[in-house]
């Protein structure tokens, strides 16, 4: 039998063309070891840093260490089902989370998946969690206020849209309470809020969500929760997830506020991941890039100009600036702000609000130490009404604290010193504020005006808050138009001042 090479080649060619096998060309490797949510994979030569890796059972991991012959990855989720020898595939994608208005009012985990039992989130868009912060040219200076509704903050440590203001203090000093009050006060201020809970007890997160719901704040808030029961990897990425969700609004000419509660726990989670990946430890066993961990996150909070927004939206939004304001929280140990992570975050942010245990225990809440709390850029954003009335407050408090220390040892004090001490005691009392009760700018202005003009000088210290409460009620019922005017203009003209003066004087006569 004679073989015809041409026929054979034709036959082979037709067979190959008729072959219907689907091919899946992807870089794949093998699991070498699994320990504490960290997986070593051999053979993934094309993996990118930060790439999503696919494990059996629809489990995903994040490639963090790219070494010569292996890849170190963290598992996002349950890792109990992964065993040595399993096949791992590259996905070619960087970790993405859902973004957009569909997330508002929901509680999600670090991957953007709903955990509140209210059904799926049909978000139309996703975005990568690691992004480069806007450059210098894209930014605009901070000149619009973020009203927290807290007298001590809005008068002495004002916050502007696009600022990063650190809330720092020991445990149980009211750090979360300050942040939650700031979120509650954004009602009607055209501000979308993101609350990122990192490494907290699930019960604490539930309490925060309940407080936000009762105040009607969940209507404009997204909660990203990575509780203490979640893996270190989930706690580490949750801050970036929340930031990406906030950036969606910033880049479209809207304003957003994000609270990271707290970054100390995120740093600890990152330290755990780094040590398990065998990265060399440095000071306090943190890895060498722990500064970069927080700087690349907090630099993404910025106020961007109209050109940036127009270019980003391809001309859909014109003439609008966007902002992302960050309120990171740091927990200190016994008031030690010179520890590694606190000093890092202090140097990255645009100011800090110090909360002190001694003040908190003395009943001064919020327990803000006015002497060492600063806002480096917020002064330009403060409203005229509050700025004009709060100038003397910080000075009064500073002098009071200084004199109070000496007054303990002095038996007889001259009249001017006694007057300063009395005034300081009243100012301190007046700056106290109950939780979940932020004040509108008009009532805050009235309070500051009353203390500045000496209307409280002859009121007993223990009756100061009752006087304030009564005055607010009187103004709401008898001078609603004046309050409305102050809210709208955010300034105190001569007519408004005359009416306010008359109203406070009239109320004081009736106050017993």
Swiss-Prot record:
Magnesium recorded as keyword: no
Location in the cell: Cell inner membrane
GO CC, one annotated term: plasma membrane
Catalytic reaction equation(s): ATP + H2O + 4 H(+)(in) = ADP + phosphate + 5 H(+)(out)
This enzyme's EC code(s): 7.1.2.2
Disulfide bonds: none
Keywords: ATP synthesis, ATP-binding, Cell inner membrane, Cell membrane, CF(1), Hydrogen ion transport, Ion transport, Membrane, Nucleotide-binding, Translocase, Transport
Site, Required for activity: residue positions: 373
Superkingdom of this protein's organism: Bacteria
Protein name: ATP synthase subunit alpha
